[in-house]
Amino acid sequence: MTTALLLCLCLLLITYLMGSIPTGYLAGKLLLGIDIREHGSKSTGATNVFRTLGKPAAIAVLAIDISKGVMAVALVRAIYSGDWLPALPAAWQNWLTLGVAIAVVLGHSKSIFLKFSGGKSVATSLGVLFMLNIWLALGTLATFLTVIFFTRIVSLSSIVAAIAVNGIALALQLPPPYLAFTFLAGMYVIVRHRTNIERILQGTEPKLGEKVSSVPDRKGVA
């Protein structure tokens, strides 16, 4: 039992550190030599990378951030499907999945490498959803894309998707740990967007493709 608990703690630490890899921050440093937290919306997420560094960089950051969530859940499944580590109780699998999912999401938004700052955890949460249930992920993504099609406001689309994911999870009758993740991650994404909510209510939230203040010259950046 002690060995199993230590293994679980190690998994939580590993997935937190995985989530903490500051993809958007590194992109800013490598491409323009800037701290992206000082530009645009100050976030290290893909939306601010798009506005600050351009589309190719944003696509790369988005893909890597999604892969963080995918790999966190995949790591748990790999341990349960193999015999290369001490066996963990089968009853723990879904709850351990919940644990690593929360850890990787927190790592993305509260990176130890950035003094506990970071992105808003939307992309990493989506990566987790793809591993929990493909229909859950596709339904949530469809909600996001529908809202962004009509409003062109990324933050509003993320907030609506964070609410909708709970209804989709309930409709799919997912296990309690998965329902817990959709609720906790959904609430967390909304909280992370609190300043965006203020701007939405004031009618000042920038739309996709609009310029924002404090965006550096991208001349020469692909």
Curated annotation (Swiss-Prot):
Catalyzes the transfer of an acyl group from acyl-phosphate (acyl-PO(4)) to glycerol-3-phosphate (G3P) to form lysophosphatidic acid (LPA). This enzyme utilizes acyl-phosphate as fatty acyl donor, but not acyl-CoA or acyl-ACP. Its main location: membrane. Probably interacts with PlsX. Belongs to the PlsY family. The chain crosses the membrane at residues 4-24, 56-76, 87-107, 130-150, 153-173, 174-191. It comes from Synechocystis sp. (strain ATCC 27184 / PCC 6803 / Kazusa). This is Glycerol-3-phosphate acyltransferase. Its EC number is 2.3.1.275. Pathway: Lipid metabolism; phospholipid metabolism. NCBIfam families: glycerol-3-phosphate 1-O-acyltransferase PlsY (TIGR00023). It catalyses: an acyl phosphate + sn-glycerol 3-phosphate = a 1-acyl-sn-glycero-3-phosphate + phosphate. The lineage of its organism: Bacteria, Bacillati, Cyanobacteriota, Cyanophyceae, Synechococcales.
